[in-house]
């Protein structure tokens, strides 16, 4: 076996510039400088989508490595100091603890990591989204790895024809379950069609057993017990040679699907694929955005990124997303633009409702009954 490489993508919202729209250049410079000093990494890139900083790192220490997670945590702490100096909005909001405990999972930042033996050619895509939640990856990952109308390789590539194994997390019960596709396709859809609770964590090739994709599944609100911003997930997808081609991995985003998040994390909106220079959400703090950064790995070195969604081929998707956004905005505070009440539990909505609870009185349904015939006659 050859040497195994670990690709870690760890993200956090450290403070918005301006509001929730983007990241101040000084924060990116701080992250770059801190990672450059580390002896742990083979290579790294610092990116952002909206107001989230994404640390893309390669190393040889495997997933859940305490030293790598501590490095990312320290980067975010350094950036938080700069954010507070600049009085950026929500400085350090994704950091839910004051002390590092060996792993950033459960402490606020989102994490997607995979370890694999680098192939002869290793194309990967790092997807990063803003103003939405981890379930936003469910439909795209399903289409990439299970839908032959999206991925023709499932039909004609003998290395893909056997299908893929999906690992799904229940974010409420903290449980996981695996499905073997295509034979358990309908069973999978029972769960991933509810992306607020069930999220695709990882995908594995049934032909090779190798990992093909992994996503961050951290839910900030569930960890903090209050609304502290949307989760803004990341996802890593390996491509080609028995896995979806790059174009097959990008194709699901050509037709924007609806995701939860947007303004105050309380609305449904289209996930708009954008170039890196268009990733600052502004209209109603949105619509939700997704970027796609393509890399070739070479001995763990990151060659790239290629800004995939900057292509004019996605102009139509952006136009469609804007049209969907305009229609949904016309509904204002009404569902289905606003999230249903059960999904508003961790927003500020309960505080407003609590103020009014004493104004509710019981309804006597006997007063609502139809009058009997004799009562009508008496009148």
From Swiss-Prot:
This is Fructose-1,6-bisphosphate aldolase/phosphatase. InterPro entries: FBPase_V, FBPase_V_sf. Pathway: Carbohydrate biosynthesis; gluconeogenesis. It comes from Moorella thermoacetica (strain ATCC 39073 / JCM 9320). Catalyzes two subsequent steps in gluconeogenesis: the aldol condensation of dihydroxyacetone phosphate (DHAP) and glyceraldehyde-3-phosphate (GA3P) to fructose-1,6-bisphosphate (FBP), and the dephosphorylation of FBP to fructose-6-phosphate (F6P). It comes from the Bacteria. Consists of a single catalytic domain, but remodels its active-site architecture via a large structural change to exhibit dual activities. Mg(2+) 1 binds at residues 13, 20, 51, 93.
């Amino acid at each position: 076996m050859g040497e195994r490489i670990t690709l870690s993508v760890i993200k956090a919202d450290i403070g918005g510039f301006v509001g929730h729209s983007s990241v101040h250049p000084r924060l990116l410079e701080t992250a770059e400088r801190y990672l450059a000093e580390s002896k742990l990494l083979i290579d790294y890139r610092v990116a952002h989508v909206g107001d989230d900083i994404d640390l893309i790192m390669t190393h040889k220490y495997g997933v859940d490595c305490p030293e790598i997670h501590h490095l990312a945590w320290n980067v975010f702490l350094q950036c938080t100091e700069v954010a507070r100096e600049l009085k950026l909005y929500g400085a350090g909001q994704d950091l839910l603890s004051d002390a590092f405990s060996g792993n950033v999972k459960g402490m606020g930042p989102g994490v997607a990591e995979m370890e694999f033996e680098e192939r002869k050619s290793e194309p990967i895509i790092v997807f990063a989204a803003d103003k939405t939640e981890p379930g936003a990856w469910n439909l795209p990952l399903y289409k990439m790895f299970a839908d032959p109308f999206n991925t023709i390789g499932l039909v004609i590539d003998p290395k893909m024809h056997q299908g893929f194994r999906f690992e799904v997390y229940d974010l409420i019960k903290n449980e996981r379950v695996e499905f073997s596709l295509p034979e358990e396709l309908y069973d999978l859809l029972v769960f991933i069609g509810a992306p607020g609770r069930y999220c695709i964590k990882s995908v594995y090739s049934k032909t090779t057993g190798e990992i093909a994709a992994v996503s961050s599944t951290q839910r900030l609100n569930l960890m903090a017990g209050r609304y502290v911003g949307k989760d803004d997930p990341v996802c890593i997808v390996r491509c080609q040679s028995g896995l979806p081609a790059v174009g097959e991995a990008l194709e699901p985003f050509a037709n924007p699907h609806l995701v939860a998040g947007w303004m105050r994390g309380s609305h449904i909106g289209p996930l708009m694929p954008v170039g890196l220079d268009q990733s600052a959400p502004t209209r109603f703090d949105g619509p939700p955005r997704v970027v796609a950064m393509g890399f070739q790995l070479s001995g763990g070195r990151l060659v790239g990124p290629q800004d995939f969604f900057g292509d004019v081929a996605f102009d139509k998707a952006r136009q469609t997303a804007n049209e969907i956004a305009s229609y949904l905005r016309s509904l204002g505070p009404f569902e289905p633009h606003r999230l249903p009440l059960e999904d508003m539990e961790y927003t500020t909505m309960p505080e407003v409702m609590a103020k009014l609870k004493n104004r509710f009185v019981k309804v006597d349904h006997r007063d609502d009954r139809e009058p009997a015939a004799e009562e009508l006659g008496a009148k």
